[in-house]
Amino acid sequence: MKRITSLLAVLCLTALLAACAGKGAGQLPPPESPAAAERSEQLWQALVRQSARHDAAPYRLGLSLRFGSQGDTRRVTALFWGNDDSHLRLDVMAGVGAVIANIVEADARFLIYSPRENVAYFHEGSTKPLLKVGVPVPLALADLSALLNGRFLRAFGEGHTPVAASSPDTAAFALEKRLGGVLTLDAQGLPVRWTENGDKGWRMELLYDEQGLPRRLNLTHANGQKAIVLVKQRDTVQQPFTEEQLGLALPEDTPLLPLSRYRAPADGKVAP
């Protein structure tokens, strides 16, 4: 009987040690545990510090944008500039010097002008106007500006609740305002993935340059739409842009239509 009791004790001790070993590196504690809460808060504070590194300032970015679905994609280039996130210009080009769209966003007002068709569309509100013109980027220009320039809290908001992460080196948060969804941070506190709420929403992955600024956004949607936004060039801007440089003067005979009147061309290509 003593031998059986001793054997059972050894087996129980072995099982206990194995269980403890299984909780070592490589496994995440439950989100509600003190260790998980501490790790999440540390990475969120790292995000706060990352965002604080980049004040709003005049900028100009050269972008490349590829978008579409499997077997049907387009590539355009763009110049994106502004003094901060409140008054922005985006010129979209299909070739060298061939501007196909001039876009202005200021104080939640959005204006897009097609020089080829001499027609302009306007929109006012907090929705995502780029989606309405067939460009699969689920962000307002102000959010895109903040994101590409490293002002992550401006883009994603400050309200957050820790949720289970997919790896020990990351932390995930349900966002309460702004874009909503779930944001994943890496070990440096940089956003590496954002997933929209719902099973039919957007997913965005972020890659960075040596300065810790986004250089590539990979966007996918459950319906098959995809977009890749590449930052090809960051220009140093010494002086703030003037109102004329940020504004958009339309020809006098330009029809001005609500963005709800926008219709994609019959050939299925995004326009303007």
Segments (PLM) and residue ranges:
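N-terminal leader/targeting segments and the immediate start of mature chains
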Residues: 20-75, 250-255, 260-272
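Amphipathic hydrophobic-ligand
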Residues: 72-76, 101-105, 200, 226-227
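An acidic-aromatic
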Residues: 86-142, 225
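Hydrophobic lipid-interacting interfaces of membrane-associated proteins
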Residues: 64-70, 95-98, 113, 178-181, ...
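Sec-dependent bacterial lipoprotein signal peptides
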Residues: 1-20
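Gly/Pro-enriched, hydrophobic low-complexity segments
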Residues: 157-265, 269
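One face of beta-strands
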Residues: 57-65, 76-78, 86-92, 101, ...
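Extracytoplasmic segments of membrane-associated envelope/inner-membrane machinery
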Residues: 128-158, 173-179
